[in-house]
A protein has these predicted regions:
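Conserved active-site beta-strand element of glycosyltransferases/polysaccharide synthases
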Residues: 22
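Conserved N-terminal beta-strand and adjoining loop/helix that marks the start
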Residues: 1-19, 36-39, 93
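A short beta-loop-beta micro-motif enriched in histidine and acidic residues
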Residues: 7-8, 45, 89, 108-110
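The catalytic Nudix box helix
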Residues: 32-68
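Nudix hydrolase/Nudix homology domain
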Residues: 25-30, 91, 95-143
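Active-site segment of metal-dependent pyrophosphate-handling enzymes
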Residues: 56-101
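Short, charged/polar surface micro-motifs in flexible loops or helix N-caps
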Residues: 14-19, 27-28, 38, 68-73, ...
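Short secondary-structure boundary/capping segments
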Residues: 3, 11, 84-86, 104-106
């Protein structure tokens, strides 16, 4: 049995044919926006909060084409992995549409950010699942 579990979200902010990735200071890799759920928060609420807190942007989380009843708007996937002292890390992955005229407000959690295309995702120095979910975010079709 796993002693501890951590629930988190990842958010791919999408602007047309590009998604936002950040260079995470502590982990030294390119990732989507994200963080852990706070007490009483749903994954969707956490996704909206993390996007706002880490970038200053509001996202539009819409129901995706083909989504089943009860699936939160913008949910593109789920993954889990062992995360050291945090135990099992359970991560809900979302895509949110963001406005073209609003840019990222820098944050102390990341050193740099980029809006990347599918081709740029191919060469991104990041874990494979980050690129795979990035492709899903770019392919997401709003209902």
């Amino acid at each position: 049995m796993i002693a501890r579990r951590a629930f988190s979200v990842a958010v791919y902010a999408r602007r047309g044919a590009r998604v936002l990735v950040i260079e995470h200071r502590r982990l030294a890799t390119w990732l989507p926006i994200g963080g852990e759920l706070e007490a009483g928060e749903t994954p969707l609420e956490a996704a909206a909060r993390e996007l706002r807190e880490e970038t200053g942007m509001a996202g539009e989380f819409r129901v995706l084409a083909g989504a089943l009843d009860g699936v939160p708007p913008g949910l593109i996937g789920y993954e889990e992995h062992q995360a050291g002292s945090k135990g099992l890390h359970m991560n809900f992955v979302f895509v949110a549409r963001v406005a073209d005229d609003v840019d990222v407000t820098p944050n102390d959690e990341f050193g740099a950010w980029r809006w990347v295309t599918r081709r740029e995702l191919d060469d991104l120095a990041s874990p494979l699942n980050v690129r795979q979910f990035g492709y899903l975010a770019l392919d997401a079709d709003w209902a």
